[in-house]
Amino acid sequence: MRGAGWWSGRETALLVAIAMAISIAVVALFLVRPWSGAQSGPPRAVIVDQLTSEMPKPPFVEATSSLLEQAGYEVDYYWGEEITVDFYRELPTHGYDLVLLRAHSGLIQGGDRDGEAFLFTGEPYSGSEYLKDQRAGRLLMATYGLGPDPSFELRDLPRYFGIVPDFIESSMMGEFDDTTIVVMGCNGLTSESMAEAFIQKGAKTVVSWDGLVTGDHTDEATERLLQLMLTDGLSMGDAVERTRTEVGPDPWYGSNLLFYPGEEAVSTIP
């Protein structure tokens, strides 16, 4: 009879094999964790459609998804109330190569951050949620209208959480991995605050507008930009310049499509 402390060669080999399997599994978990930036397989894109609140997948989304899929991308789509504070918080962890932010955006008015850009979520504002971020000034109450109108007051407008550049740098989890980010809403590059925050968070290039922009115009320009880069193989700088020439500035507000930082003119998306 074998003593309690005695192991046969077969049992010893089995224990070693189990230990090795556990070690390999642990290593694998670290290799595939979503915030590592390392990934295999086809490039990935996401369309973040905060503008759509009632009926998902407007024509722009259908056309752009088809264009991306033909170029070999896996495409995810989120819309409306799915675009929460925590959705933005976790966005870098998903390993996207291309992020299309079809979302309202604007400029902070007044205070120390006057003129900084911010992004709308689709999550109704509450003074009792995300208190740490609110107290730190990384979230704000965002609302919008068509302009001064005596028929309504501020309290009558819908209110949403908005995220500011400091939220991108300090509250988003993980890092982007040389991601191209297209901010399709207004004023994304009126100042460089939001774009620089994305760059500091690991993005490669940010594309947006230097003023107000209408929904139809940003849809048309973004679709053409992607065609030029994905189908024609143009660099970011050349594609933006060509889009400006072909599509032109916004017909109502005169805003222009820009990209940041300027030295990324030769970059392409996967």
What are the residue ranges of the model-derived segments?
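A diffuse structural propensity rather than consistent per-protein peaks
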Residues: S8, I83-R89, E153, Y160-P165
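Catalytic cores of nucleophile-dependent amide-cleaving enzymes
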Residues: S126-D219
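Active-site-proximal C-terminal subdomain of hydrolase catalytic domains
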Residues: T179-P270
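Juxtamembrane cytosolic interface motif at the C-terminal end of transmembrane helices
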Residues: V27-P34
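N-terminal Sec-pathway targeting helices
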Residues: R2-A21, F30
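A domain-level signal for caspase-like cysteine endopeptidase catalytic cores
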Residues: P34-G145
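Short coil/turn linker and secondary-structure boundary residues
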Residues: W7, E82-I83, T231-L234
